[in-house]
Amino acid sequence: IEEDHLDFFKDINDIRNSFNRFANLLPENGNLIINTDIENYQDITDGIKAKVITYGISDETADFYAKNISYDENGCGNFTLVRYGKETEKYQLHVSGRHNISNCLAALAVADCYDISAKQVQMGLSGFRGTERRFEYKGEKNGFTIIDDYAHHPTEIKATLSSAAVYPHQKLWVAFQPVSYTHLRAHETLSDL
């Protein structure tokens, strides 16, 4: 959660309050699945009646946690799932980046809520190669590997650049097109990297 859509929200506190109001709409028998890597995520869960299920890469106390994270030669993640404090299965992703390990943890938490087996999840993940315009391999030309990504705010840009950092290449070139205030702010972040 970060400052985005400031044409609608006043500031970051307004954004957090909006998430909290939304979470409070969940019924008591519902589930809120939330990333503990979000700064002050408890602001969002405050006062809700639904069950809170957590996941995270940085928080070993999260209900769903990735342990023994490693990356293959294409930057695709491997990890051991820790579910409710117990080491369970190993997972191999076919998409690159730490952020996709986090996305996978969220999907595993959802699957758990619906009693979808680890084997079924692993089958689904084995065929998942990413989505259009998210670190999408476009081809090679004159010795360059072309990757397209529509990262449009600072956190996404950092995640994309982190994915690129472990991708096999000699030198990284970035073509960046800022088309909004958030993109311009992201450009400042990009220049800091």
Residue spans for each PLM region:
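Hydrophobic side chains in well-ordered alpha-helices
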Residues: V121, I157-T160
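Active-site glycine- and acidic-residue-rich loops that bind
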Residues: H152-T155, V179-L184
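Acidic, Mg2+-coordinating active-site environments of NTP-dependent enzymes
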Residues: I1-I146, H169
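Structural beta-sheet core signal
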Residues: I34, V174-F176
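Structural/interface elements that position substrates and couple domains in central-metabolism enzymes
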Residues: I147, A151-I157, Q170
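Cofactor-binding loop segments of dinucleotide-utilizing enzymes, especially the Rossmann-like FAD-
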Residues: I57, Q177-V179
